[in-house]
């Protein structure tokens, strides 16, 4: 099973979340997201979803809700980047709950931004030919889609990191431990002993110390036995 190193995933998450924050700040600073051409006068008016207020010729009240969603996504992304940085520096634990929290916040921020930009485009299409003649989007609008992609990628990497940790806890065994276990299993063999044979008969040799009559008298007392086993 292929396992991506956790440090590489955390470094990629820091890079993606930091890039998303920079893109959001750039979108906040630049106000020319779209150019509105009103009906009465042909002067172009720039507008941005970060403003919240609408031009006098476009009485749209729901733009404030879009601005709040954009600001909420920026705040969540800052906290998300902080959590990922603390995790990368081992200041918080590397458990499964932290990975799930980072993945959830990343997906939530990306979905919130996507919903806000979809609502903004819907309001532009709704106001077209009613309050203004036409509108033209600028290049800065496409940075919000790149920001959404960065947040979704960060969430996917967090879930991959969580999956790696779960798989490592359940199935993965360190190389040294697995090799030692394999060596132990290979070296341990059951050696069966042969059945015990019957005891050999003993050969008893009788020796007498003194020949003749005296030897026969003291034979019971001075008799010695030498036992040899026939192998």
Swiss-Prot record:
The keyword Transmembrane applies. GO terms for cellular component: inner acrosomal membrane; outer acrosomal membrane. Keywords: Cytoplasmic vesicle, Membrane, Transmembrane, Transmembrane helix. Residues 35-71, 121-139 are extracellular. Pfam families: TM225. InterPro entries: TMEM225. It is found in: Cytoplasmic vesicle, Secretory vesicle, Acrosome membrane. It is a multi-pass membrane protein. A motif (RVxF) lies at residues 225-229. The chain crosses the membrane at residues 14-34, 72-92, 100-120, 140-160. Residues 1-13, 93-99, 161-231 are cytoplasmic. It comes from the Eukaryota. Probably inhibits protein phosphatase 1 (PP1) in sperm via binding to catalytic subunit PPP1CC. Interacts (via RVxF motif) with PPP1CC. This is Transmembrane protein 225. It comes from Rattus norvegicus. The gene is Tmem225.
């Amino acid at each position: 099973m292929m396992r991506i190193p956790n440090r590489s995933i955390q470094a990629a998450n820091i890079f993606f979340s930091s890039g998303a924050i920079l893109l959001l700040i750039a979108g906040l600073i630049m106000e020319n997201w779209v150019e509105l051409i009103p009906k009465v006068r042909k002067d172009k008016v720039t507008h941005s979803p970060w403003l919240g207020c609408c031009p006098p010729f476009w009485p749209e009240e729901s733009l404030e809700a879009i601005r709040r969603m954009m600001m909420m996504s920026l705040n969540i992304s800052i906290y998300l980047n902080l959590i990922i940085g603390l995790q990368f520096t081992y200041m918080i634990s590397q458990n499964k709950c932290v990975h799930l929290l980072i993945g959830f916040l990343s997906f939530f921020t990306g979905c919130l931004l996507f919903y806000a930009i979809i609502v903004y485009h819907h309001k532009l299409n709704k106001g077209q030919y009613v309050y203004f003649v036409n509108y033209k989007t600028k290049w800065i609008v496409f940075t919000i889609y790149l920001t959404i992609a960065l947040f979704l990628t960060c969430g996917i990497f967090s879930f991959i990191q969580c999956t790696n940790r779960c798989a490592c806890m359940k199935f993965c065994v360190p190389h040294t431990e697995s090799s030692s276990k394999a060596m132990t299993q290979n070296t341990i063999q059951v050696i069966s002993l042969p059945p015990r044979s019957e005891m050999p008969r003993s050969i008893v040799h009788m020796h007498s110390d003194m020949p003749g009559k005296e030897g026969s008298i003291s034979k019971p007392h001075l008799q010695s036995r030498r036992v040899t086993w026939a192998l």
